[in-house]
């Protein structure tokens, strides 16, 4: 009989968990599991308090689900990754573990941690088994003709869909209940430093809750997703991002439920649908993270970005963070982030574009602020989104494209329903004036307790275009490539 240890990290689920499935293949093996928290490491990586809280409550939920399978989930608090490695080695010795099972993580610090774990445990005679679990296909399975990581989403998407037509990744079922063990018990998970600071009504706890949310979206919202997804006042998106980010649900299972609930539609229609596009963008950004490790250090993927002279006005940055820029759609989005730890995707694009191309603040400042506040914070997606907005990443928006807050506001929140929800100071402003409340305030001589715009949009746009153009030209004159 062998003793197998499952090392849970960013995969807090029992359904379709590759490491869990593989560890439970032999009915005679004893299976235990472990989660090691690393508060200092998370702090250094700017993981948000809301995400940590969300994760801890799901860890408790996972522990109860594992107990139903007669699998103990042990818990230990270390400080950082290096400290966690030493504890893992100690744990394996203490519990006489034979085999360690875990699912890969792809950021550079996590990859180095796993390299050290495998090296040190293997030297001590333990068998270490890692699995690709977070993505539909591994980076080695999706390569361009030069056997390199794709840099253009369209070509990446085409390759993935081609692979899916040939092979739909299968989901692993929940393992069968292990033989009863008198040592089975519920270990204590410390919540001494964790507050319930996320909205449980907005993001209910539990793998089953995530599964139900996915199924309800596919049944009731999928058909209208393309038409309604850009309107932040509508309940039109899946709201699955926190669950995907913490590994409470898998992208494979998202695809499985989509294909099952919409089985009357042709496969290619589903694989090219706008919602599945979002799953593929997630895959794309992860493949970039794997293929270009410097992304983990917030380095851009174009060389000319270093020539941009950022203004980095601290007062403007604080106004942006607090939702006090005087641009209603920007401020409503930022206040949604501050309140919920989540922001509608359209608003993420608008607010990030505004920070980088109108306020001319280094995109890394925005990246840091988002990741330290988002409940669905994810290095690959957050970095990819910010580099996209700043026009310095792979397949990014052209630098000449700058989101106009007024146009975006009128288009996607015409009646101001979303704006008034998060900016109560504007509750008395008529709907058709909500996008430029100060003009109405002057006309009616009605004072509103809301800041004036901190910049002139038109002037800031001209300045931005000039600076970005100069940066590209300067690099070109020096004989260097633009990307």
Swiss-Prot record:
Classification via PROSITE patterns: DNA_PHOTOLYASES_1_1, DNA_PHOTOLYASES_1_2, PHR_CRY_ALPHA_BETA
Residues where FAD binds: 225, 237-241, 376-378
Pfam families listed in its UniProt record: DNA_photolyase, FAD_binding_7
Residue ranges constituting the Photolyase/cryptochrome alpha/beta domain according to the UniProt record: 2-136
Secretion signal span: none
The enzyme's E.C. designation: 4.1.99.3
Domain of life: Bacteria
GO BP: DNA repair; response to light stimulus
Enzyme class: lyase
Reactions catalysed, as given in the entry: cyclobutadipyrimidine (in DNA) = 2 pyrimidine residues (in DNA)
Molecular functions (GO terms): deoxyribodipyrimidine photo-lyase activity; DNA binding; FAD binding
Note accompanying the cofactor annotation: Binds 1 FAD per subunit.
Main function: Involved in repair of UV radiation-induced DNA damage. Catalyzes the light-dependent monomerization (300-600 nm) of cyclobutyl pyrimidine dimers (in cis-syn configuration), which are formed between adjacent bases on the same DNA strand upon exposure to ultraviolet radiation.
Self-association and partners: Monomer.
Family assignment from sequence similarity: Belongs to the DNA photolyase class-1 family.
Protein name stated in the entry: Deoxyribodipyrimidine photo-lyase
Organism: Buchnera aphidicola subsp. Acyrthosiphon pisum (strain APS) (Acyrthosiphon pisum symbiotic bacterium)
